[in-house]
A protein has these predicted regions:
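N-terminal targeting leaders that direct proteins to extracytoplasmic destinations
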Residues: 1, 7-8, 12-104
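Extracytoplasmic/secreted proteins, especially bacterial periplasmic and envelope-associated proteins
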Residues: 36-39, 52-55, 70, 87-90, ...
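A cross-taxonomic marker for long C-terminal extensions/tails that follow the last structured domain
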Residues: 45, 84, 198, 205-223
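Sec-exported extracytoplasmic/periplasmic mature domains
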Residues: 62-65, 80-81, 93, 97, ...
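Alpha-helical linker/edge segments of TPR/alpha-solenoid repeat scaffolds
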Residues: 80-91, 97-107, 112-132, 197-199
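Short, surface-exposed beta-strand segments enriched in small/polar/acidic residues
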Residues: 107-114, 132-169, 187-200
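Periplasmic peptidoglycan-binding/anchoring modules of Gram-negative envelope and division proteins
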Residues: 116-149, 173-179, 216-223
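Short acidic capping loops at alpha-helix termini that bridge into adjacent secondary structure
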Residues: 183-187, 211
Length: 223
């Protein structure tokens, strides 16, 4: 999913309809056909016809303009619903790679309420972390460094949000370093609280899930 300059995915907070809100008019197909494809995709996924939605997303990928994070997100979600873990993680890898290439990747982890550890059902996140560590190593291989930042919604006090977001960023950094020791000196963790909230309603539900994100972006290395 693309948010301005941000490329991100979400399977735990955002509504499925948001994950499927694609701008198909940018594809090299007619506007009428693009509109029809978008409607078919949304209906198939929200109607729980995941085999059909997967086929449609794969057909979009065959178009040169279809190779983008939002489409790979659809492939990821559809495969996950079908219990196809390996194809789902391959799609996640493409999302992570394209986000890193775009210099900013936003990912929604499902943290425990008010805490800096992941929710109990963290089964996809272990695989996410492994892939993110691989892509982070590639992104910093040329001597650049990376900032891992955490963001919160507008509910609660800002000092608390700042502290919580830093704890979450440090948690994600440590998970990455556990996978790739060479990342320890290349990643800095920062917490921004709600200062960069994108929705900023403070509702703490799926409508403002984008506010509670982890971002990966290039940063200057410490001298």
């Amino acid at each position: 999913m693309k948010i301005g300059q941000r490329c991100g995915i979400n399977t735990c907070g955002l509504r499925a309809s948001e994950a499927l809100a694609h701008d198909f008019s940018s594809f090299e197909i007619s506007q009428c056909k693009a509109h029809a494809v978008g409607i078919s995709l949304t209906r198939a996924y929200t109607g729980k016809k995941y085999q059909e939605s997967l086929a449609l997303f794969n057909s979009v990928l065959r178009n040169p303009a279809g190779d983008q994070p939002r489409v790979h997100t659809g492939v990821y979600l559809s495969n996950l619903k079908l219990g196809r873990r390996e194809p789902a993680m391959q799609a996640f890898g493409k999302i992570a790679q394209q986000g890193m290439d775009a210099k900013r990747l936003a990912v929604k982890f499902n943290f425990q309420q008010g805490g800096a550890s992941l929710a109990k059902d963290a089964s996809p996140y272990d695989r996410w972390v492994k892939e993110l560590a691989v892509q982070s190593a590639k992104a910093t291989a040329s001597g650049t460094c990376m900032e891992v930042s955490a963001h919160t919604g507008r509910s609660g006090s800002e000092p608390l949000n700042q502290r919580l977001s830093l704890q979450r960023a440090e948690y994600v950094k440590q998970r990455l370093v556990n996978e790739r020791k060479d990342l320890a000196a290349k990643i800095t963790a920062k917490g921004y609280g709600s200062s960069e909230a994108l929705v900023a309603t403070g509702r703490e539900d799926s409508s403002d899930a984008l506010d509670r994100r982890i971002e990966f972006k290039p940063a200057a290395c410490a001298s």
